[in-house]
From Swiss-Prot:
UniProt EC number: 5.3.1.6
Primary role: Catalyzes the reversible conversion of ribose-5-phosphate to ribulose 5-phosphate.
GO process annotations (BP): D-ribose metabolic process; pentose-phosphate shunt, non-oxidative branch
Location of the active site: E103
Binding site for substrate: T28, G29, S30, T31, D81, G82, A83, D84, K94, G95, G96, G97, K121
Family matches, as SUPFAM superfamilies: D-ribose-5-phosphate isomerase (RpiA), lid domain, NagB/RpiA/CoA transferase-like
Family recorded in the similarity comment: Belongs to the ribose 5-phosphate isomerase family.
The protein, known as: Ribose-5-phosphate isomerase A
Keyword Metal-binding: no
Gene that encodes the chain: rpiA
Domain of life according to the entry: Bacteria
Length: 219
């Protein structure tokens, strides 16, 4: 089974967490694109979706899935999204696709977070994948200096502007022993919008595509 086939298996497996007549929170990325394809097969049974990125919004609209503004929605029963890394405690690094802020907002609203990945994303300790940090443009150099003080090696992601009009610093060489603590420390730096650690709001369910099929883990 190829990596993409494992992603597809995880994406389709997430359908069972979608409630009838509900509004579904939808993330961003290659694995989520498979989930969106799956969701389109039951679009008549759901009210619609809330999206974490312009890219996912466009894909869902093209498939005929109604997309709602989060401000018009009282609750989301489930949010389905991928991860760049996830550990055994359901803490994640996300934001490789630069949609981390909106992803974090939608995840905060949802009652259940279902994370869909292939088996290459499971790690013991977070940090081998560089940690994305969304930053107000004028604060980029200041924030980079503060991240160095935390032991990281920040690199400006050239040519990338987030859906919110901000920039991304990718922080290398962090061995993240306490994800919740580091998430709070980085978010406390003036000029940081948010960072890609999802530890305060981790996943509730993890669906992992493997060569043997989809494995399910719960928090």
């Amino acid at each position: 089974m190829t990596q993409d086939e494992m992603k597809k298996a995880a994406g389709w497996a997430a359908l069972k967490y979608v409630e009838k007549d509900s509004i579904v929170g939808v993330g961003t990325g290659s694995t989520v694109n498979h989930f969106i394809d799956a969701l389109a097969t039951m679009k008549a049974d759901i009210e619609g979706a809330v999206s974490s990125s312009e890219a996912s919004t466009q894909k869902m609209k093209a498939l005929g899935i109604p997309v709602y503004d989060l401000n018009s929605v009282d609750k989301l029963s489930v949010y389905v999204d991928g991860a760049d890394e996830i550990n055994g405690h359901m803490d994640m690094i996300k934001g490789g696709g630069a949609a981390l802020t909106r992803e974090k907002i939608v995840a905060a609203v949802a009652e259940k977070f279902v994370c869909i990945v292939d088996n290459t994303k499971q790690v013991d300790i977070l940090g081998e994948f560089p940690l994305p940090v969304e930053v107000i443009p004028m604060a980029r150099s200041y924030v980079a200096r503060e991240l160095v003080k935390l032991g990281g090696d920040p690199v400006y992601r050239e040519g990338v502007v987030t859906d919110n009009g901000n920039v991304i610093l990718d922080v290398y060489n962090l061995k993240i022993i306490n994800p919740k603590e580091l998430e709070e420390k980085i978010n406390a730096i003036v000029g940081v919008v948010t960072n890609g650690l999802f530890a305060k709001r981790g996943a509730d369910v993890l669906l992992v595509g493997t060569p043997e099929g989809v494995k399910t883990f719960t928090a």
